């Protein structure tokens, strides 16, 4: 079995694109529509990487990152944040929360896989 990744995004279109790209590359992919749903899933299933949108209802990507970093099981798990914002202050906030990487939307499949391969070596 390949490495497992959770894709967290309130846009079902974005989740499907991320999931398709990663599954095509041999990863096992779980999906969640927001940070709260992701936390519930991650209590029952461990993953090797978290890819999360920043702007979501209930629990946004930065809040999700902070919550995961406070849990022993996810204190070192790579977390990539996705956003339409290229604001340096937002990037700094994400990194301070514990994000490992950052992808600005829109992005293509090659860009996604390059970042995933960088933070999650084979």
Residue ranges and their predicted role:
Residues 26-33, 41:
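Short hydrophobic/Thr-rich beta-strand motif most characteristic of the beta2 strand and flanking loop
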Residues 53, 83:
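Active-site residues of response regulator receiver
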Residues 56:
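Receiver (REC) domain active-site loop signature in two-component systems and cognate sites
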Residues 100:
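Short, glycine/charged-rich "phosphate-handling" switch motifs in NTP-dependent
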Residues 107-116:
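C-terminal output helix
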């Amino acid at each position: 079995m390949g490495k497992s990744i959770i894709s967290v995004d309130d846009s079902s279109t974005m989740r499907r694109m991320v999931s398709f790209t990663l599954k095509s590359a041999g990863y096992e992919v779980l999906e969640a529509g927001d940070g709260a749903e992701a936390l519930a899933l991650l209590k029952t299933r461990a993953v090797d990487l978290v890819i999360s949108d920043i702007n979501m209802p209930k629990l946004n990507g930065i809040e999700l990152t902070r919550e995961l970093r406070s849990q022993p099981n996810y204190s070192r798990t790579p977390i990539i944040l996705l956003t339409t914002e290229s604001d340096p202050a937002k990037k700094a906030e994400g990194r301070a929360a514990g994000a490992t990487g950052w992808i600005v939307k829109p992005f293509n499949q090659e860009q996604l896989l390059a970042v995933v391969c960088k933070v999650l070596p084979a």
